[in-house]
Amino acid sequence: MNPAHLLVLLAVCVSLLAAANIPPQSLNLLQFKNMIECAGTRTWMAYVKYGCYCGPGGTGTPLDELDRCCQTHDQCYDNAKKFGNCIPYFKTYVYTCNKPDITCTGAKGSCGRTVCDCDRAAALCFAAAPYNLANFGINKETHCQ
């Protein structure tokens, strides 16, 4: 093999080894998904299209207690955005899960801690609220005005 090719191959291998040591930075939504599954027994997918407020957006009157959990979570994120540079959907944070307990760590009042507290409250609310299968996948245009 040509020495130049070996040098390129060596450089690629070293780069891959270095990249393997970089810890993956998960997005907040992945952390929220894990938190939901820590607090309760349902998968996070059970909430994506639930009611008027679970999932993207939200309008109208919440359909039930679980939908109110999602509305409150949306409002909590809106409050977190007041930090100026705080983007809740992408802000990562530190927490521990000891099923079903969740503990947020980090500086109280910081963007990360605030977002963690929002997600923690929502995950615990989801776990405690009754789940009405009839409210999953509803037509938001007709039910959420």
Swiss-Prot record:
It catalyses: a 1,2-diacyl-sn-glycero-3-phosphocholine + H2O = a 1-acyl-sn-glycero-3-phosphocholine + a fatty acid + H(+). Residues 1-19 form the signal peptide. Its cofactor is Ca(2+). Its EC number is 3.1.1.4. The keyword Ligase does not apply. The keyword Repeat does not apply. Residues 20-27 form a propeptide. GO terms for cellular component: extracellular region. Pfam families: Phospholip_A2_1 (PF00068). Expressed by the venom gland. The active site is at residues 73, 119. GO terms for molecular function: calcium ion binding; calcium-dependent phospholipase A2 activity; phospholipid binding; toxin activity. Keywords: Calcium, Disulfide bond, Hydrolase, Lipid degradation, Lipid metabolism, Metal-binding, Neurotoxin, Presynaptic neurotoxin, Secreted, Signal, Toxin. Binds 1 Ca(2+) ion. Disulfide bonds join 38-97, 52-144, 54-70, 69-125, 76-118, 86-111, 104-116. Belongs to the phospholipase A2 family. Group I subfamily. D49 sub-subfamily. This is Basic phospholipase A2 2. It comes from Bungarus fasciatus (Banded krait).
